[in-house]
Amino acid sequence: MKALSKLKAEKGIWLVDAPKPEMGHNDLLIKIKKTAICGTDMHIYNWDEWSQKTIPVPMVVGHEYVGEVVDIGQEVRGFKIGDRVSGEGHITCGHCRNCRAGRTHLCRNTSGVGVNREGSFAEYLVIPAFNAFKIPDDISDDLASIFDPFGNAVHTALSFDLVGEDVLITGAGPIGIMAAAVCRHVGARHVVITDVNEYRLELARKMGATRAVNVAQENLKDVMKELGMTEGFDVGLEMSGVPSAFHAMLDTMNHGGKIAMLGIPGGEMAIDWSKVIFKGLVIKGIYGREMFETWYKMASLIQSGLDISPIITHHYKIDDFQKGFDAMGSGQSGKVILSWD
């Protein structure tokens, strides 16, 4: 089968002929229809420090996808040939304390599709049936293929009550932009998103952000004044991993504010903890998606009218995968879809 593999311990990714993955009794075999390129895939492509420590070579990568079930393990129930599915990319152990308590997204023995095991940038993918999610008929393949990052956005955005609240999102990558759309859809008042990439800030405006602020050109406190905000943001969603962005968030949060952190700093990050203490802030780390509550919420949000389609900006056939990675690497894109049909 065709597959995109991290074939060598250097920058790049290669289209190869790989063996079709073997199934177990509890697995599904999925024929991939569309995949999307993630920031993680770009880290692997660029072969940065994290990738060098994490990714075994060779490895078929990718973890954002939609496909069709073409074979079913003998112990699997609840799926049939022809079901359209995406799936949770975190494969969990099922026997640690968090798994047994139903907090599977916090499994301490997680294995990642396309990171620690064969991924979805291939004509076929095998995953445990437990990890598969059936896609409703009224949700397109394009949208289903980005459920993984959309889930990061939904999990982060819905960590706290948003109705009537003022929300600050730092980082206008695709996940931050989708989070802005979610916040507006569920009833936030002002949703302000910050970045220095004007292309992505314009995408955020299309997705419904109240204000998309280029912090290289505008002062965040001036924007707050313009919006009539006198006490600070009620909820902060940190999506950038950039220390200066988080510092700005701490400066502009209201007393009693709540912060959800998804962005991963490049290293240790010092902050003024007195602001956290004296403002009485709550800070919550976000990892992955809640299994499978986040997945149900994703489908329901789209079915209730949330439109995240503007975040998809580029489509390529798999033979043109290099153009897709170039588009993602340029910073002048939203989500990039690769078609395997």
Curated annotation (Swiss-Prot):
Superkingdom to which the source organism belongs: Bacteria
Localization annotation: Cytoplasm
Alphabetical list of PROSITE patterns matching this protein: ADH_ZINC
Residues reported to bind Zn(2+) 1: C38, H63, E64
Cofactor annotation: Zn(2+)
GO cellular component: cytoplasm
Residues holding NAD(+): I175, D195, R200, L262, G263, I264, I286, Y287
GO molecular function: L-threonine 3-dehydrogenase activity; zinc ion binding
Assembly behavior: Homotetramer.
Its job: Catalyzes the NAD(+)-dependent oxidation of L-threonine to 2-amino-3-ketobutyrate.
Full protein name: L-threonine 3-dehydrogenase
Lineage of producing organism: Bacteria, Pseudomonadati, Pseudomonadota, Gammaproteobacteria, Alteromonadales
